[in-house]
Each structure stands twice: as C-alpha cells, then as structure tokens.
Amino acid sequence: MDIKINDITLGNNSPFVLFGGINVLESLDSTLQTCAHYVEVTRKLGIPYIFKASFDKANRSSIHSYRGVGLEEGLKIFEKVKAEFGIPVITDVHEPHQCQPVAEVCDVIQLPAFLARQTDLVVAMAKTGNVVNIKKPQFLSPSQMKNIVEKFHEAGNGKLILCERGSSFGYDNLVVDMLGFGVMKQTCGNLPVIFDVTHSLQTRDAGSAASGGRRAQALDLALAGMATRLAGLFLESHPDPKLAKCDGPSALPLHLLEDFLIRIKALDDLIKSQPILTIE
C-alpha cells in the first residue's frame, strides 16, 4: 500500500524516503542550517526528503531537561522551513488539542511511542485527515501494532505509516528485531514501514536522567533494517552532537550525512531492483 505525501510516494516497494532532521527545535538559525544541508544532500542523491523536528519533548526524564521552543514558535519555524525549502514537514503531538493546529502546518503528524495506545489522542489525530506516523512502542510486539491501526481506521483515517524504534531488552537497553518489520507489514495490510535508527541506538546509564547512545553503530543498524525492504528511514543529525540539547549521543554528525546516505541508497536500490521472493 502506497501513501502520497505531497509529490512523494511512500511505499515498501518504492525508493526509500528520508525522514530526517533534528531531535528538537533549538533555534530558527540552527534549524535552517540543518535543513539546508539535508536538502542539499538529498537533492544531490535523488532521495525524497521530509524534514523532521519536535517542537516539544514532553516526555523528558527530568523536569529540568530542555523541551523545545513550544507549539506556537515551533509552527512558525516549520512554516519558514516549508516556505524556504518547499519540502514536507513531520512533527509529533502529545495532546489532542495540538493535533489540528499542527495538521494545518505540517504534512505528517507523529504519534509518539509512549502515547500510541492513548485513544483520545489517536482519534484527534485521525480526525485531522493528515498522514500519521505511528511510532511502535518499545513495550509492544510488532503484531500488536494492528490494534493501533484499527483504532485509526475506526476513527476514519487509513493514511498511516508504521515506525520501528527498538524494543526494550531488559533494563536500560533497546534492540531491533529484524523479523518485526515483516510482521508489521503482514499484520497491518502492508502499510509503509519506516525505521527510526537513531532512537533505536539509545541506551541509559542506571540512575541517569539523560539518554546515552551508540551512534558509532548507526550505519550497521540502518543497513540491516533497510535490507528488509522498507519504505523509509528516520534519521536525526546535529551539527555538533556534543552540544545537542536532546539525544546527542545517538545523533549522526551532520557532516557525515552524505557518506551515510550514499551507502543507504545503494543498498535500497539493490534490494528493490529484485522481485519480491515469497517463501511459504
């Protein structure tokens, strides 16, 4: 099943789409700088591109952690991104009242993993009519995503994307089950499945409020996931990850973006040049 996002076709058998940007909006200047580099690289490589950032990180572990610029300022920044670069934008919402204002600016709205079973939020998102990206909760099996998909269908919206972002593996660790990509496709009507590689690299030190990460393994994990024939890759970068206000240890250094994507595109092109082989 393919989904249209403006002039972009998103489907498991179509060339992969990059959902990329920064974890959280820090300022207008840094946002435009990061987005400009993404646009330059993706246009050079011929990769369809959707800009990603959060206006509010409402689920930070510490009340003292940076959350973002807020809804009002965030929407202004997204409007400037769209006006300057002419690209679609995706951002996440956390409360039902945010859904309609965000949907009026952003092309895709995202359901956070921790909130994916919140029915009131699901219904409010569905009613916007926008394309919705559903983050798979760390605590759910891939097949359980079907229940969330059915909620959206009952609320009148079938324009859905499914996003893997890792599964809890004991305490303070995430792993990615490569078989889960196929399970989500099979149980959810072959909806587009994308892979959030940077959040899947998160770790946490016992007792720490801040997430750690394993960015050195980002390419290995991304290639493994994309080899399963996915619709897209979800990737966060930062000009200087050490200075990032959220999830810096998992962020790809921005200057490595082109070399990273060259390898991802080469694999995606190879995988999708071959016919699907069904093994019963």
Swiss-Prot record:
Pathway: Carbohydrate biosynthesis; 3-deoxy-D-manno-octulosonate biosynthesis; 3-deoxy-D-manno-octulosonate from D-ribulose 5-phosphate: step 2/3; Bacterial outer membrane biogenesis; lipopolysaccharide biosynthesis. Belongs to the KdsA family. Keywords: Cytoplasm, Lipopolysaccharide biosynthesis, Transferase. It catalyses: D-arabinose 5-phosphate + phosphoenolpyruvate + H2O = 3-deoxy-alpha-D-manno-2-octulosonate-8-phosphate + phosphate. The keyword Cytoplasm applies. One of its GO terms (molecular function) is 3-deoxy-8-phosphooctulonate synthase activity. Its EC number is 2.5.1.55. This is 2-dehydro-3-deoxyphosphooctonate aldolase. Its main location: cytoplasm.
